[in-house]
Amino acid sequence: MADVKVQSESESSDSHPLVDYQSLPPYPPPHPPVEVEENQPKTSPTPPPPHWMRYPPVLMPQMMYAPPPPMPFSPYHQYPNHHHFHHQSRGNKHQNAFNGENKTIWVGDLQNWMDEAYLNSAFTSAEEREIVSLKVIRNKHNGSSEGYGFVEFESHDVADKVLQEFNGAPMPNTDQPFRLNWASFSTGEKRLENNGPDLSIFVGDLAPDVSDALLHETFSEKYPSVKAAKVVLDANTGRSKGYGFVRFGDENERTKAMTEMNGVKCSSRAMRIGPATPRKTNGYQQQGGYMPSGAFTRSEGDTINTTIFVGGLDSSVTDEDLKQPFSEFGEIVSVKIPVGKGCGFVQFVNRPNAEEALEKLNGTVIGKQTVRLSWGRNPANKQPRDKYGNQWVDPYYGGQFYNGYGYMVPQPDPRMYPAAPYYPMYGGHQQQVS
């Protein structure tokens, strides 16, 4: 077998920024029927119209039925190939059908003793798997496994075959099955230029049978500049979540597609097209949330705070689900998700790592919803309490606290939605009406 690149424990996860697709159950069930008295005729009540809901979804996570149009899917934020080692394989190398095809598989439910050597042997067969690199994510304090890792293959075809063959199959020397999925970042791809535009669009209402290739073909037939297409899959079932993203190389074609392709059928359903927000904008203006410039100015002057508030979480997101995308950016001290609050807190060891995570993940999709990030308050930074026992807060912290953490809820910018009149505002939060 050809040489395999195995990353050492000392390598920071920053060199290989990899994130898994978030696994989530289906949407919450509809409202139960309302009991009526026997002497009254029984009817089948329907849930109240969305505009009757006057409470912020952060306080009522059970009402958050559908996410707002998500951000550009993470595979489009491509990263430098620091440790990409090619080796020869039998036959011709597979040429990607189009740019952006993923070659990296996320491996979950790893036991503490499962290291890179174990993964290498587990995925190697007589056919000689074309493995490029391996990495088990470890805790920097004690070196223990975080329970997941990544395996990059030479081509998308090989990775796809491994995913189909091994997912759910028994792991060697254990009685547990493999838990595999596509990684959200492909380590073999080149990162987009920081100053380059991210010309992506959101595509919703996709039929269950729509694949990456079909979505790409649907748009590339009319727009030659299409570079990539991605259908978001559920990590547990492997089925489509009903939406995806298409990235263009030409801004004019992207603009035309926003209008011309809206309502066009892909497979058996008409597509719903929406804008995907750029990765980087002034004042952190993001689709699904808008961070006032004042909050960003305050955070720039605070070089000690390393805690990030994460708003807009759905109730099925776990601590581990929240930790995985953030762990790409550096060492994490703690992750907390208050029960029933629709939010969480992630505390980093280093300030620069927290700044990068806030910039890159604000407005991305974690679970089934777009999250809104802002600076929280480190538990060590105590604030005086008012006469009601509440922590003193100023406009930056927004009056929200949990277990010593303070946070603000960024306000959405309705102008970012092409159908703003049809997206009611609940308590200052943008929520999609399905």
UniProtKB/Swiss-Prot annotation:
Q: Does the keyword Cell wall biogenesis/degradation apply?
A: no
Outline the extent of the RRM domain: 103-185, 199-278, 306-378
User: Might you report a single GO cellular component term?
Assistant: nucleus
Q: Which domain of life is it from?
A: Eukaryota
| Keyword Nucleus set for record | yes
Gene Ontology BP term (one): cellular response to heat
Q: Locate the region Disordered.
A: 1-50
Which InterPro entries does the record match to this protein?
Nucleotide-bd_a/b_plait_sf, RBD_domain_sf, RBM42_RBP45_47-like, RRM_dom
One Pfam family of this chain = RRM_1
Question: SMART domains under this entry?
Answer: RRM
- MF terms in GO: mRNA binding; poly(A) binding
Keywords, ordered alphabetically? mRNA processing, Nucleus, Repeat, RNA-binding
Question: Which subcellular locations apply to this protein?
Answer: Nucleus; Cytoplasmic granule
Listed under subunit, the entry gives: Interacts with the poly(A) tail of mRNA in nucleus.
Q: What does this protein do?
A: Heterogeneous nuclear ribonucleoprotein (hnRNP)-protein binding the poly(A) tail of mRNA and probably involved in some steps of pre-mRNA maturation.
Protein family: Belongs to the polyadenylate-binding RBP47 family.
Which protein are we looking at? Polyadenylate-binding protein RBP47C'
**Name of the gene this protein is made from:** RBP47C'
